[in-house]
């Protein structure tokens, strides 16, 4: 399975999770990350909240984000009046939802690891 297919499957898993929660809806943004306009991987919401979500699934102990990727998420969220979130799954574990401000910043990128995700992150049932 290609990296692209794995990413799409991870996004779909999150979308199904939102639809299982009463009053919530979610959809995948096709082409996110590959067009010149800022766009998250997933948009989710209910009658009172909107979430812009960047989704990652990794077998590694670390997940890196280019600074531009996070900047685009924040820009989209601001323009759409949505809450920016990052959903990360390490080693086929649960998805942890982090706020961009919780990521560790290096000179050129942002990074999250499983310990950070468990300490600072939320499971989906805690962000809805």
Predicted regions and their residues:
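Short, charged, amphipathic alpha-helix that recurs within catalytic cores of restriction-modification
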Residues: 58-89
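Domain-level recognition of nuclease-like catalytic cores that cleave nucleotide substrates
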Residues: 5, 83-128
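Alpha-helix C-cap/termination motif
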Residues: 21, 45, 79-80
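Active-site metal-binding core of divalent-cation-utilizing nuclease and nuclease-like domains
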Residues: 25-47
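Acidic-basic catalytic patches of nuclease active cores, encompassing PD-(D/E)XK
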Residues: 1-31
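Amphipathic alpha-helical interface surfaces
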Residues: 14, 38, 69-72
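Conserved catalytic cores of phosphodiester-cleaving nucleases, focusing on short active-site segments
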Residues: 18, 42-59
């Amino acid at each position: 399975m290609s990296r692209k297919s794995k990413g799409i499957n991870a996004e779909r898993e999150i979308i199904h999770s939102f639809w299982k929660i009463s009053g919530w809806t979610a959809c995948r943004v096709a082409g996110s990350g590959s067009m010149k306009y800022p766009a998250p991987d997933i948009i989710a919401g209910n009658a009172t909240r909107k979430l812009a979500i960047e989704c990652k699934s990794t077998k590694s102990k670390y997940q890196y984000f280019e600074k531009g990727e996070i900047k685009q998420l924040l820009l989209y969220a601001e323009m759409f009046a949505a809450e920016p979130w990052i959903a990360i799954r390490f080693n086929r574990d649960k998805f942890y939802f982090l706020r961009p401000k919780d990521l560790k910043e290096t000179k050129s990128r942002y990074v999250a690891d499983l310990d950070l995700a468990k300490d600072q992150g939320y499971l989906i049932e805690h962000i809805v």
